[in-house]
Amino acid sequence: MESLLLARLPEAYVVFSPLVDVFPVIPVFFLLLAFVWQAAVGFR
């Protein structure tokens, strides 16, 4: 389905395809950020 969606995108959006590849990593990044923040405040 994802390849079908990317195939339908206009030529202008081809530039953003590397950005779309990064999107699934963002929730993991926020989870790590929350963990680091809790470690910084001492797990209150």
Curated annotation (Swiss-Prot):
It is found in: Plastid, Chloroplast thylakoid membrane. GO terms for biological process: photosynthesis. GO terms for cellular component: chloroplast thylakoid membrane; photosystem II reaction center. It is a single-pass membrane protein. Its main location: plastid. Residues 1-7 form a propeptide. The chain crosses the membrane at residues 23-43. SUPFAM superfamilies: Photosystem II reaction center protein K, PsbK. Pfam families: PsbK. Disulfide bonds: none annotated. It comes from the Eukaryota. The keyword Chloroplast applies. One of the components of the core complex of photosystem II (PSII). PSII is a light-driven water:plastoquinone oxidoreductase that uses light energy to abstract electrons from H(2)O, generating O(2) and a proton gradient subsequently used for ATP formation. It consists of a core antenna complex that captures photons, and an electron transfer chain that converts photonic excitation into a charge separation. Belongs to the PsbK family. PANTHER family: PHOTOSYSTEM II REACTION CENTER PROTEIN K (PTHR35325:SF1), PTHR35325. PSII is composed of 1 copy each of membrane proteins PsbA, PsbB, PsbC, PsbD, PsbE, PsbF, PsbH, PsbI, PsbJ, PsbK, PsbL, PsbM, PsbT, PsbX, PsbY, PsbZ, Psb30/Ycf12, at least 3 peripheral proteins of the oxygen-evolving complex and a large number of cofactors. It forms dimeric complexes. This is Photosystem II reaction center protein K. It comes from Thalassiosira pseudonana (Marine diatom).
